[in-house]
């Protein structure tokens, strides 16, 4: 339920406005947009936050596809070629990193633009394949869903009893709302030929991602007999094990391999552009021209060194940091879009309400989580409520609608 509502009313709205504001401002990056509509202090905060997020995206989206490809390799070639799992994982991690380096340095139409049609085909096969497998698989896959009532959607089924609020809204960091998408909007905005494409490119793409997320949510609910059983599978490796086991068992050997490759596409198509966007943000901040390959390497090499070091950390911890940074970026972008609508006398609540909600999610998570301040749950919730109220008051008191006839209103078509 949270994926559906979040995707339609928050995630897709977030993606649409981040994209269209970038289009209206000549392909401007998220930090520049936040600086224009929320002020310089927010721009500096967003520069740092976006950079952290992009590096974390690149790292977590190396680990998960490398794990899936390692499982494929070991199951098919491991015994016959006497392969070591650890060494195989290092090889795939290195291969993915090398691809990211090339994609970061080479113009977007030379590498990414050429391989994305193939990636898209794999993604479509994975999505439709898993969906129809859920419908027509012989075994009773829907046993756990069939027993659910509406009230059970609000029942906490976490094996260790962790609170639903706000953790679920940070754990589901991409299928409902994703601040990472805002960092990629300039790449798409600069490629668009007509503003009319925005609804399909930005809003529609997020709805598509939400559908894929729902398909895998159903797989998680039905493939395992209980949340505890799925959690045990995750603890044996990473979430990639759940993907691999379910795909190969539900679609057979060949279909499962194609589905796994389709899932591999998802993180790789995020990771390859994340380091590129990080390079561009740094170059923009320090005003380093990027036409020269040497100057690109000056930024890219340190980024990849830092990223490779971070891959050695625990995946679960990395995912929590990524989730928080992702949702906090979305929060700031939603406030930015709300500020644009509010200042130009538009119906701002379509962005303001999601912004308020995401502020409470991010603030409460940071206050409660062990990777944050580790406060008691009740205290953390009240901290989240207080900070959200403060942000809302600041929004309406510090921002002023632009008066009719103001010269700025003519340079920003409403």
PLM regions: where:
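Flexible loop linkers connecting adjacent transmembrane helices
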Residues: 5, 13-42, 77, 190, ...
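Helix-loop-helix module between adjacent transmembrane segments
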Residues: 6, 10-26, 30-104, 133, ...
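Extracellular/periplasmic helix-exit of transmembrane alpha-helices
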Residues: 19, 134-151, 203-245
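Loop-to-transmembrane helix boundary motifs in multi-pass membrane proteins
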Residues: 40-47, 51, 85-95, 204-213, ...
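Hydrophobic alpha-helical segments and their helix-loop junctions in multi-pass secondary transporters
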Residues: 58-75, 79, 87-94, 99-104, ...
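C-terminal membrane-solvent junction of multi-pass transporters and transport-like membrane proteins
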Residues: 85-89, 94, 108, 112-119, ...
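Hydrophobic core of alpha-helical transmembrane segments in multi-pass integral membrane proteins
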Residues: 98, 127, 304-309, 384-397
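Hydrophobic, membrane-embedded alpha-helices of multi-pass small-molecule transporters
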Residues: 131-139, 152-216, 261-270
